[in-house]
């Protein structure tokens, strides 16, 4: 397979996998042999190339509506990750707790839901379709956010906060697949997927800016009430405008009717071009594969384990800062809860800058192929090698400038380098893992990487405030910077020896 062909085939997968798109999402070119027998099975396909039930034939307005709604749902789920953070101190006073670990947990436990829930929602969307996952998760997301708003003790709050994270992660899990189901032109599809990807990028930055002023003026509970209003509006719009777009689900229901009428089992087209049709798999088998295969990759593929650990550690550091910014800027600079939310702007601009640079360099360097014409996954790693040193520089800058109480803009400028350096690591690593595993392993490797990433984001922040209390802002952030320095050679090592690890430990699950 030539490099460009491989890249085009796999690029759909990587972008869809931003939301952990399941292995069996349909992105295939069908051969329109509807109801043609195949051995003991009936092949269920579209009724010709113009079948109106096929999302690829829906009008462009449907594509726009689904893209906007799914992107808004994804943004809402990510807004909730940190929107409440500036109000955590108010919750601590109301519930009479002074334990900094518990206070940090009220923010970060939400992300544990992002780590665990996709292992269930992804296979469920494969079996029952994407639409039911959206509607069900929206209802639970609304209910659990309201439960957070009316919690009467901290234990109840933490429990409902975790469940809200489980429900809020669903649009990220299946949203990219919804956009890809339409198979619009590459330009429109890329634009839509970039819009969808802004949710995980901007949500955690915009959330505390809004939440800070809400908490300051009307209290921390209103951050959840306002979030619930947003979710309710989006849920109503979803019920009105969203339709099932998964080809596997639509054809599966058509096949179920045929099986009921004829008694014969059915098959649907393969999930990727050139793949043979396959029979409907049992739900138990699909769920088992979604749970087991990512774990096998982490255990048996050192390249997956090492890079997943690296990005998870970096991602956890970002959320350590997110959970401690209010205490740092309120304590060191006397910011109000509302103004302290603005301290997230620096890291947000850094992330956006890294995103644009990655897209630019990606276009310049991702066409590199080996002597066999195959894409070289290591071609995505130079950005990480060049800019990963910015991460420890950012921590040293932020820590000592805040410790010495220089002008508040100086530590915020330091967080810009943290945001830039962290995303200069996370994005190339994600691309490398997906292209190194190929289309058939992309879903599982991203499920494994994302699970580890959100576990670190949930638990690493718990040590943040205690670390600052013991070491101070200067040496506390220097400790984080030194750990980043220790890990800094990882990109260069994989750029040099990544091909050897891929050959020595191939994906064979």
Swiss-Prot record:
Keywords noted in UniProt: Cell membrane, Glycoprotein, Membrane, Transmembrane, Transmembrane helix
Keyword Lipoprotein recorded: no
Localization, UniProt: Cell membrane
Sugar attachment sites: 8, 26, 189, 367
Annotated coiled-coil segments of the chain: none
Main subcellular location of this protein, as a coarse class: membrane
Cellular component GO terms held in the UniProt record: plasma membrane
Function text: Efflux pump that might be required for efficient secretion of fusaridione A or other secondary metabolies produced by the fusaridione A gene cluster.
The family this protein is said to belong to: Belongs to the major facilitator superfamily.
Protein name, entry field: MFS transporter fsdG
Species annotation: Fusarium heterosporum
């Amino acid at each position: 397979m030539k490099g460009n062909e491989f890249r085009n085939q796999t690029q759909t997968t990587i972008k869809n996998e931003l939301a952990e798109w399941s292995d069996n999402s349909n992105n295939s070119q069908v051969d329109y042999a509807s109801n043609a027998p195949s051995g003991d099975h009936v092949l269920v396909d579209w009724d010709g190339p113009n079948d109106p039930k096929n999302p690829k034939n829906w009008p462009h307005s449907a594509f726009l509506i689904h893209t906007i709604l799914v992107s808004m749902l994804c943004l809402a789920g990510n807004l909730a990750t940190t929107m409440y953070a500036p109000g955590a101190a108010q919750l601590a006073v109301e519930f009479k707790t002074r334990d900094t670990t518990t206070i940090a947990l009220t923010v970060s436990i939400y992300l544990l839901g992002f780590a665990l829930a996709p292992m269930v929602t992804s296979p469920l969307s494969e079996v029952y379709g994407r639409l039911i996952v959206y509607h069900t998760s929206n209802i639970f997301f609304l209910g659990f956010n309201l439960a957070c708003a009316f919690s009467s003790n901290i234990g109840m709050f933490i429990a409902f906060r975790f469940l809200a994270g489980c429900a809020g992660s669903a649009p990220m899990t299946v949203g990219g697949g919804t956009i890809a189901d339409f198979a619009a032109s590459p330009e429109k599809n890329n634009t839509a997927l970039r819009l969808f990807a802004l949710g995980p990028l901007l949500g955690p930055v915009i959330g505390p800016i809004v939440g800070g002023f809400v908490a300051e003026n009307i209290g921390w509970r209103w951050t959840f009430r306002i979030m619930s209003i947003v979710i309710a509006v989006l849920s109503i719009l979803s019920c009105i405008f969203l339709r099932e777009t998964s080809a596997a689900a639509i054809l599966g229901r058509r096949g179920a009717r045929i099986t009921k009428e004829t008694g014969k089992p059915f098959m649907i087209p393969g999930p990727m071009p050139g793949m043979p049709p396959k029979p409907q798999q049992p739900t138990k088998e699909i769920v088992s594969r979604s749970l087991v295969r990512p774990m096998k990759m982490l255990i048996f593929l050192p390249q997956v384990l090492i890079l997943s650990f690296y990005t998870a550690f970096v991602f956890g550091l970002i959320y350590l800062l997110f959970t401690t910014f209010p205490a740092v800027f309120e304590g060191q600079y006397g910011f109000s809860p509302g103004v302290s939310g603005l301290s997230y702007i620096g890291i947000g601009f850094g992330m956006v800058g890294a995103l644009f640079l990655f897209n630019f360099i990606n276009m310049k360097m991702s066409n590199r192929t080996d002597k066999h014409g195959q894409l070289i996954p290591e071609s995505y790693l130079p950005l990480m090698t060049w800019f990963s040193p910015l991460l420890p520089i950012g921590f040293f800058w932020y820590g000592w400038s805040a410790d010495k109480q220089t002008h508040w803009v100086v530590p915020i400028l330091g967080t810009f380098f943290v945001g830039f350096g962290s995303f200069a690591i996370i994005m190339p690593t994600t691309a490398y893992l997906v292209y190194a595993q190929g289309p058939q392993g992309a879903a599982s490797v991203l499920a494994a990487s994302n699970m580890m990433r959100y576990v670190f984001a949930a638990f690493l922040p718990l040590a943040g405030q205690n670390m600052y209390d013991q070491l101070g802002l200067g040496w506390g952030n220097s400790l984080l910077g030194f750990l980043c320095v220790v890990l800094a050679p990882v990109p260069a090592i994989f750029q040099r020896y990544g091909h050897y690890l891929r050959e020595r430990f191939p994906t064979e699950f």
